[in-house]
């Protein structure tokens, strides 16, 4: 688990091979102020927007 200050970098792994996220609900709060249903969803957003969104906490924002 890599931390950047108080924020945690999501473990996205090899996202290019993944096209869908699991439906498990484990909300994480991103540095963009959005709540994501799980870490995979945040990774998907990172990849789509090419932004370095980190996790501020393992809960809703």
Curated annotation (Swiss-Prot):
Localization:
Secreted
Q: Name one GO cellular component term.
A: extracellular region
Q: Which residues form the signal peptide?
A: none
Task: Give the keywords, sorted.
Answer: Disulfide bond, Protease inhibitor, Secreted, Serine protease inhibitor
Site annotation Reactive bond: residues: 23-24
Q: Which Pfam families match?
A: Kazal_1
Q: List the disulfide bonds.
A: 12-43, 21-40, 29-61
Give yes or no: UniProt keyword Ubl conjugation: no
What InterPro entries does the annotation carry? Answer: Bifunctional_prot_inhibitor (IPR051597), Kazal_dom (IPR002350), Kazal_dom_sf (IPR036058), Prot_inh_Kazal-m (IPR001239)
Which residues does the UniProt record annotate as the domain Kazal-like? Answer: 6-61
**What Gene3D superfamilies would the database entry show?**
3.30.60.30
What GO annotations for molecular function exist for this entry? serine-type endopeptidase inhibitor activity
In its UniProt entry, what is this protein called? Answer: Probable pancreatic secretory proteinase inhibitor
């Amino acid at each position: 688990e890599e931390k950047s200050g108080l924020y945690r970098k999501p473990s996205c792994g090899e996202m290019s091979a993944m096209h869908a996220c699991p439906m498990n609900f484990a909300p994480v709060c991103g540095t963009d102020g959005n709540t994501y249903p799980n870490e995979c969803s945040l990774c998907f957003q990172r990849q789509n927007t090419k932004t370095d969104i980190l996790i501020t906490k393992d809960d809703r924002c």
